[in-house]
């Protein structure tokens, strides 16, 4: 399997303070990996560097999907982000638009123009997450777990090689959280690389996979 993320001796800062130092790890195509650590340990900051939301002040190498983050021009950032699917714990769906309209909005914003292609892609991603029969529902009509499935569908729209899931079960009950993690593992089996940040070690025990740990400003594998 090819390596799609390669960090070597990277330093990560927030508000001009080092949160992680000497970060070195790789992530391969189709790999599922947990990112664990206490609140404030640097999990989210590390993820944000991967889609250029947080700049990397120094490092030997920081490559994501063929993009050199240490020398990435601002105009290239949208091209990087189109190759990455991002899943947050707080859903961030447009509340005044249906599921279909939420997904259609993203596709049009990222350059899709043919109506049939758009509708076909929406059907594909909703089927993949088990939400094909809820496409005309409004977000407030969905449970938390259903909303998170829509968020994952949204992350899949542009066929990303990498999905970053930042505490995707944080606002869900345990049973629903298990369903979401099962879905993410299925997506990894289908070829997507998944990096999932969580502080829920029970999930890590119940769904074993590789674990990266953030602690004391260090990342250990």
Regions found by a protein language model. Give the residues of each.
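Helix-to-loop junction immediately C-terminal to a conserved catalytic motif
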Residues: 51-52
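Conserved ABC transporter NBD signature motif
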Residues: 59-68
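ABC ATPase NBD coupling module
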Residues: 69-85, 187-189
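Short coil-to-helix segment of the ABC ATPase nucleotide-binding domain corresponding to the Q-loop/switch region
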Residues: 97-105
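Conserved signature/switch motifs of ABC ATPase nucleotide-binding domains
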Residues: 137-140, 158, 190
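Conserved ABC ATPase signature
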Residues: 138-142, 146-148
């Amino acid at each position: 399997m090819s390596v799609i993320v390669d960090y070597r001796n990277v330093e990560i800062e927030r508000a001009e303070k080092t949160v992680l130092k000497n970060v070195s790890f790789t992530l391969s195509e189709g790999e599922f990996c947990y990112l664990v650590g206490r609140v404030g340990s640097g999990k989210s900051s590390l993820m944000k560097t991967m889609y250029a939301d947080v700049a990397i002040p120094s490092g030997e190498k920081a490559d994501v999907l063929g993009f050199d983050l240490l020398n990435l021009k601002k105009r290239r950032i949208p091209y990087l982000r189109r190759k990455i699917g991002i899943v947050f714990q707080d859903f961030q769906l447009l509340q005044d638009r249906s599921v279909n309209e939420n997904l259609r909005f993203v596709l049009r914003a990222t350059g899709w123009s043919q109506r049939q292609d758009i509708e076909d892609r929406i059907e594909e991603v909703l089927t993949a997450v088990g939400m094909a029969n809820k496409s005309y529902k409004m977000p407030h009509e969905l449970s938390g777990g259903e909303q998170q499935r829509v968020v994952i569908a949204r992350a899949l729209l542009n066929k990303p090689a990498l999905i970053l899931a930042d505490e995707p079960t944080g606002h869900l009950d345990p049973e629903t959280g298990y369903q979401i993690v099962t879905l993410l593992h299925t997506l990894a089996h289908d070829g997507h690389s998944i990096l999932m940040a969580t502080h829920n070690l029970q999930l890590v025990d119940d769904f074993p996979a590789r674990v990266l740990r953030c602690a004391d400003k260090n990342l250990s594998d």
